[in-house]
């Protein structure tokens, strides 16, 4: 795990956060998709930077994305009051939605959520698919 978790509260009071939204990268279990790949793809779509605040790779390392004081670009209509976390994966080898989180990713996500809930006690943790109006399978498991 990187230092991204240690600095999670650095700017906590700048935005009201009532949601922590879990996403997957929608990449196959056999495909490597790094935080740099995600950042590049988001910039190619016109985003200023990676849309998520945290990105967890298959090895369980959490990478800092946007600073928490910046509004993310991960859940239209919810970005202003949410934190976005994405894990690498979410599709099986055939490209179907599947919980592909590794044990390391599960452990890291659990620790990250514990840390964030210390600062944002009222925030609900939801999967992207659980938000009203979203018609996707992401994050491909029941949050």
Predicted feature locations:
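N-terminal carbohydrate-binding/catalytic regions of secreted carbohydrate-active enzymes
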Residues: 29-37, 41, 66
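A short acidic/small-residue loop/turn micro-motif
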Residues: 70-71
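Short, well-ordered coil loops that connect the C-terminus of an alpha-helix to the N-terminus
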Residues: 47-48, 122
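Basic/polar, cationic surfaces and motifs that engage anionic cell-wall
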Residues: 1-21, 25, 58-62, 67, ...
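Short Gly/Pro-enriched turn/cap motifs at secondary-structure boundaries
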Residues: 44-45, 74-76
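N-terminal cationic-hydrophobic initiation segments that often serve targeting/anchoring roles
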Residues: 39, 43-46, 117
